[in-house]
Each structure stands twice: as structure tokens, then as C-alpha cells.
Amino acid sequence: MTVFADHDAYIAAAPEALQPLLAFVRARLAQTLPDAEEIIRYDMPGFGSAGLIIAGYAAFSKQCGLYVSKGAISAYSDDIAAAGLKASKTGVTFSPSKPIPDELIAALALASRKELGV
């Protein structure tokens, strides 16, 4: 298992086709959560505060995932479906051919932060 020192190392190790998408998600999360710190937890990059993970992201072989609180996914389930994306209890998967909308990244991150109370 590879241990990543930081977000840059994680993105650099991801499949080349996914790197721009990961960089975009990272930038949007950083903009949306300016007071959160960049963290690596469970071998994934994320943004956290007060020891909690507000939002994280990951790369797989052909797609990426954005991971937030269960309540955030529930609150935006219609928006996720309208974007043609698939959601689990705590995540949304997307690909370069069907990226996650900019405003959905922000909405999910803010809803997750609110639910966590940080």
C-alpha cells in the first residue's frame, strides 16, 4: 500500500487521465472550505477541521469519488441524480467524461461542514 505525504503526491500517483479532475476538485474544496486543513486520512486526501473529515476525494482506475457526510448526500440527492451521477451513502462517483459540477462540489462540502458542526 502506498502512503501519500500530501495531496500533491496523491494526485501525481493517480491515473494521468484523472489528475486534472482531482486537481479541480481539490481547488474547489480549498476555495469552499478556506479554514479547513488539507489532510490525508484512510489513504485519501481530504479537508478537515477539529479532527473531523469534512470532505475527501479519491481516484480509482477510471473514475473519481467525492466523499462527504451522509446528510450532505441526502440533502443533494436530487442534484446528484440530475447531474447523471451515482451516489452511495457518503460519496459521489464521477469521471472525466461526466465530471461533477463545480457548484455541486461546493454545496456538498458546505452541507457536510454544517452537519459536522465545524
Each model region followed by its residue ranges:
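Charge-dense, helix-prone N-terminal extensions
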Residues: 1-118
